[in-house]
């Protein structure tokens, strides 16, 4: 099986401009609204920005966590939410190790990045890119990106708890 590509944002490069979130909400909902974006940028003060996206985990815990079986994988390997089945329990949100699923402020249902790539095209810092786990490991040979995520994991989680 071919290794699945996913959208990823490098916090070492991200400027926190939120062009990715604004692009996403405009593309899908025709409004600039970070709370409606399928991705997000979390700021850890004073100025460290973490762009967060779904990684379509091979063994996706969000799929198993949903009591309604509302999350599934497409034939291309993308994890999606079936809005007809989702009732907004939020178990998938809690299960996601990348804080990439949240409850939509209008529908009350889970939503997430579906890897359309609109944000990749528009990131002015080139901090967002399509990658694979193998390529990402190669890009982070020195471990500095992983170290940032590990160092700020609790802060990212706390920020997520406060997000809509």
PLM regions and their residue ranges:
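Flanking helices and flexible, charged tails adjoining ferredoxin-like Fe-S electron-transfer domains
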Residues: 1-5, 30-38, 42-64, 83-164
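Immediate flanking context of iron-sulfur cluster ligation sites
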Residues: 4-14
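N-terminal pre-ligand scaffold of iron-sulfur
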Residues: 13, 25-27, 46-47
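Conserved active-site region of classical short-chain dehydrogenase/reductase
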Residues: 15-18, 117
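Conserved long hydrophobic alpha-helices within structured protein cores
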Residues: 17-21, 124
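Core segments of cupin and vicinal oxygen chelate
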Residues: 20-31
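Ordered, amphipathic secondary-structure segments that act as subunit-interaction surfaces
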Residues: 58-79
